[in-house]
Amino acid sequence: MSKQPLRVGIGGPVGSGKTTLTLSLCNALRNRYNVAVVTNDIYTEEDAQFLVRHQALAQERIIGVETGGCPHTAIREDASINLEAVAQLSQRFSDLDLILVESGGDNLAATFSPELSDLTLYVIDVAAGEKIPRKGGPGICKSDLLIINKTDLAPLVGASLEVMDRDARKMRGERPFLFSNLKSGEGLDQIIDFIERQGLFKT
């Protein structure tokens, strides 16, 4: 009987940095763990093609799922299309350690079905404004790790990282969050450490 891989859901609004995070995680983890990816796009397989072009993983380790008009349905209410992709990858690579499931562009109410994801990372970006953490929603309040990305843009959009920090603490209680600039790699080590600790790869 093959082992069950850890399934990590990566959610967040369009443009927040989900695909950059997925690429960064693949680059950092592929030599340490047996990794595969499922991406969700509304009408194309653009994110999957992006990962292949950037040599995140071998092409056969990446499956792109087309969700149609409701990307959140494919990760929550009816996750069957994603569960099928996860099953295909698990069959193709019997010793997988980790499957990253990147959602399509979500609204703040989107969450992963517990059937599909063991651990959820939710990415928001500073450019969307400092008010985003206090808007709440399941991704911001209930994800296992909230990632506030693109910290370098704060001065350009007039966003206060201090306000975002305060609001994230208020909305999340004890749940962890961190600031990142995935373009430069800032915060990536902390994200990897979180996945390894929560996924029992590291004690």
From Swiss-Prot:
Its encoding gene is what? ureG
Quaternary structure per UniProt? Answer: Homodimer. UreD, UreF and UreG form a complex that acts as a GTP-hydrolysis-dependent molecular chaperone, activating the urease apoprotein by helping to assemble the nickel containing metallocenter of UreC. The UreE protein probably delivers the nickel.
Source organism, top-level taxon: Bacteria
Any single Pfam family the record assigns to this protein: cobW
What keywords are annotated for this sequence in UniProt?
Chaperone, Cytoplasm, GTP-binding, Nickel insertion, Nucleotide-binding
Can you say where in the cell this protein is located? Cytoplasm
Binding site residues for GTP: G12, P13, V14, G15, S16, G17, K18, T19
Q: Which InterPro entries match?
A: CobW/HypB/UreG_nucleotide-bd, P-loop_NTPase, UreG
GO cellular component terms, alphabetically, are: cytoplasm
Its recorded name reads: Urease accessory protein UreG
| Organism from which the protein derives | Nitrosococcus oceani (strain ATCC 19707 / BCRC 17464 / JCM 30415 / NCIMB 11848 / C-107)
| UniProt main location, coarse | cytoplasm
Describe the task this protein carries out.
Facilitates the functional incorporation of the urease nickel metallocenter. This process requires GTP hydrolysis, probably effectuated by UreG.
List the Gene Ontology MF annotations in alphabetical order.
Answer: GTP binding; GTPase activity; nickel cation binding
Entry similarity comment = Belongs to the SIMIBI class G3E GTPase family. UreG subfamily.
GO BP annotations of the record are: urea catabolic process
